[in-house]
Structure formats: structure tokens, C-alpha cells
Amino acid sequence: IPGSLVGSEMCIRDSNKDKDGLSFDVVCPSMPGYGFSDKPSQKGYDSKKIAEINHELMTALGYKKYLVQGGDWGSTVSKWSAELFPNEVLGLHLNLVIAFPPEKDDPMEGVTDQEKVLLGRYAKYLELGSGYFEIQRTKPQTLGYSLNDSPVGLAGWIIEKFHSWTDDEKDKLIVSLEDVLSIVSLYWFSESITSSMRLYNENGREGFSKSKVEVPTGCALFKNEIMLPPKAWAEEIYN
């Protein structure tokens, strides 16, 4: 939440403006339980499982080599793709970089003063803004009954995240209202808000492998990002 394929479509829309003669295919799989993708009928569909499904899809489509890109839970799925299929994944690109303190005597070694400020901002988010995560992780079905029964409730639950997590200016959404409503509508008409939240439960607190990937990695970093881990931490996990 609040991501969806609508965001991917927005990126594709912009990338087509000036390709400088480049030709490439873009495959945007909708994760199980999101949008109009089938809802899992059994447990076990965590980020690792989704990465395996995505690889099966790319193989079936005839791609022997490919790049992966992800943000939010897609970041963990993409990380798993690079870890599980290093011979097929040529590169990993993330717009949410997840990294945690390394397990060594001084985990703050190499962390700059500016990065410490960013860690403080993340700590504030954990204190004041992460309640949604715990609810969706522990009680996705209970919350889903309410959100799936009220379009206003669903819109409020999703749009609040856009206000809190984006670079909005003077309480004005930086994302167009039309695009935001498209995202809300996708969840509403597909009745997928409940099944999408189950991924939080499947992944537990992290849904993330801390093993280092050797696949070349690039990151998009934005000044108001919630999680901006120190470079020294990221280098312990990414190449």
C-alpha cells in the first residue's frame, strides 16, 4: 500500500517520451493478490515465492536474461530475484533500498553525520507512522472487511499514505488526483485490498534476505524517502 500497477504505467508513460533510439521490453507483473491477479488460495506466497513465480513467467515469455526493478514489497521481490537467479538477472534497480545494521562490533562504523540524521527521521516514522504496517501484518483479514466494504474508507486508507510518504507541497498531492483515484479504483473494483495486505503477514517483519547479492545494483534515492539506509549498510547487502 499504496502501490499498484498504475504507478508502473506512470513510469512507462514517462520513459517513452525520449528513448534516444533505445528499444527494450517492459514486463510489469502484478503480484499475486494484487489488482486483477489471482489471489493465493494457500499460505506461503511471500516475496521469495513471488520472485520464483516472476522468474517462471520471464522464462515462459522467452527471456533468458533480464533486469529487475522494484520498490516497496517489489524491492524485496527484486532482491530475491537477484539472489536466486544471478545467472539470468543482469542487474538490480531499486527505488526503495532496504538495509539493516550489519552484525559487527560497531554497526555505525562508516555512517556519516548526514546519514545519522536520516536514521533519526526513519526512527520518527517507526514511532508515528508505521502503525498501518503492524495492523496489516497481524490482522489483514480483519482490516480487510472494513476497507473492502467502504470506498471512502479504502480511499482514506490509501490516500493518507500519499500525503505522508510523498513530497507533497503545502498539503497538495504531488501525484495527480486522477492517478491516485485510479490506484484506489484498482483495489476497489478488483476487491484485492485484503489479499494484498496478506503479503505483510506472509513476509513477517521483514520478508527480506540479508545475504549479499553479486548482481550489479543501482538505486534511485529521493530526498524525502522514508528509509534511506547508510551507504555502508547497503554495501553489506548489494553490489
Annotate each language-model stretch with its function:
Residues 15-23, 63-112:
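Conserved hydrolase catalytic core segment
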Residues 136-239:
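C-terminal subdomain of alpha/beta-hydrolase-fold enzymes, centered on the catalytic histidine
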Residues 1-12:
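Single conserved hydrophobic/aromatic residue that forms the stacking wall/gate
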Residues 48-66:
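Conserved acidic catalytic loop of the alpha/beta-hydrolase fold
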Residues 22, 31-45, 79:
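Glycine-rich "HGGG/HGxG" loop immediately N-terminal to the catalytic nucleophile
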Residues 28, 68, 219-221:
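Structural beta-sheet core signal
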Residues 107-140, 209-212:
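The feature captures the conserved acid-bearing segment of alpha/beta-hydrolase catalytic domains
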